Amino acid sequence: SKVRSIDFFTASAVTLLPFENFALSSNQQKNQLPNQSVTSQKDQQPLRIGFISATSVGGMDLSERFYESFKKNPKQGRLREVISHDCGASTELIASYLGINDFITTISTACSSAANAIMLGARLIKHGQLDAVIVGGTDALCRFTLNGFNSLMILDKIHCRPFDRSRTGLNLGEGAGYLVLQSESSLQRAPYCELSGYANTNEAYHQTGSSPEGDGAFLSMSEAIVSSGISPEDIDYINVHGTGTPGNDASEGMALRRIFGEHVPPFSSVKAFIGHTLGASEGIEAVYSVLSIDKGLIYPNLNFTDAMPETGLIPETSFQEGIPIRHVLSS
């Protein structure tokens, strides 16, 4: 189907809120999310601050912009200059704007990009390399990306329906989401919560598809729970990946059944609100997870009507407030 032209936008200023899978806890221990940024340690030594940003399709707009000149003259068109996409340009610009230079890197691992950024930041703090790290991701859309996903035949022409029997695909979105991870020794204010565990895996089933048994999701979620030092029964809410594609939701649902059996905690996908924001998705959904603990929120899984026959799982369909939530698993 034809995709209409999209206007590009430039953000002149950003507000930073203070993976494969990670678990968040209300306890205060090692890697923490502060209420505001901290510029110095208690002993007045400068903080070692890093910036780890994720993207999945960063730089693809260059190919789109250069294509017209290439089409007019293939021998001189600027598309010949594009050897590779510089997906780290936004990372360097944001770090420069914020004055961060201790550690800067970009991660691009498709839709797990921001989750891996969060995990790397936590590890750098754990091993004493940094005191604080801004972690998350950002992605913006262009026709190149939209048509690429359209060629995969996984776009839904109407609102996506995560975990619904009638789901046929995803809706793309764009945006950014970041957290500030900080070591306990450098904290000057009470944190929102603790990043208590994390894990990623590679099931090597297929280049773009998940195993029907949910092996990858099962392993990463299980290991994240073990890493956090809690048991599956301690999870109060799950922010699932829930793209709305037939393959992902069936695979992820099988993983949930394997871990929790008949006692799957309340879960939902926020992608029906924000779309699949690609490399930014796990950063944005980490913010949702933090707010879930801080404010006692459970988000509704929009557009759900009928359970998938593969698992019979029913997500939360109403917005809930004031719920005592100690541990959130984000997939």
Stretches found by the model and what they are:
Residues 3-7, 81-88, 105-113, 169-171, ...:
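Active-site nucleophile and cofactor-binding loops and adjacent substrate-binding regions
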Residues 129-151, 156-167, 198-212, 240-249, ...:
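Acyl-CoA/ACP chain-elongation machinery
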Residues 159-228, 237, 324-326:
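Condensing-enzyme catalytic core mediating Claisen C-C bond formation in acyl metabolism
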Residues 1-31, 35-53, 59-60, 220-232, ...:
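Conserved active-site "lid/cap" helical segment
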Residues 70-80, 96-107, 156-164, 201-202, ...:
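Glycine/charged-rich beta-loop-alpha catalytic/anionic-binding loops adjacent to active sites
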Residues 14, 18-19, 87, 95-98, ...:
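Active-site-proximal alpha-helical scaffold in enzymes
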